Amino acid sequence: MFAVYANSMSQTDPMSGLVIGDRPEPEVPEGWTTVTVKAASINHHDVWSLRGVGLRQESLPMILGCDAAGFDEDGNEVIVHAVISDPDWVGDEALDPRRSLLSERYQGTFAERVAVP
């Protein structure tokens, strides 16, 4: 599928690691669903990721993008929330010490489809 992703990171030239091309369809963990992305926005988080902040080398290639709007598998319009908490966490996911954002541990929203909880 068509995607925009980080293939490498650079403190001095972050955009050099940005690639536009094909990536595999998202792997969908049990209990998650797939969203067909219709709109996504670039955030400063994406630039920091290309600089190597919050993104580990062993996670590359990583589809960037934290938020999106689109359609779920049933055709419902949805807005994708970027914060992913631990499955065992109860309460505000922003307070979960094991939380992450899409495009840190899980492939992000700059693609035709994204897997989300």
Where are these regions (language model features)?
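Glycine- and charge-enriched low-complexity intrinsically disordered segments
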Residues: 109-117
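Generic structural detector for well-ordered beta-strands
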Residues: 22-24, 115
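Short N-terminal binding/cap micro-motifs at the start of the first secondary-structure element
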Residues: 10-20, 44-46
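Extracellular C-terminal loop/segment signatures of secreted glycoproteins
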Residues: 97-98
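Glycine-rich beta-strand-centered segment in the early N-terminal region that forms part
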Residues: 24-41, 53-91, 102-109
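Short structural boundary motif marking the start of a folded domain
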Residues: 1-4, 33
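A short beta-strand micro-motif
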Residues: 3-7, 78
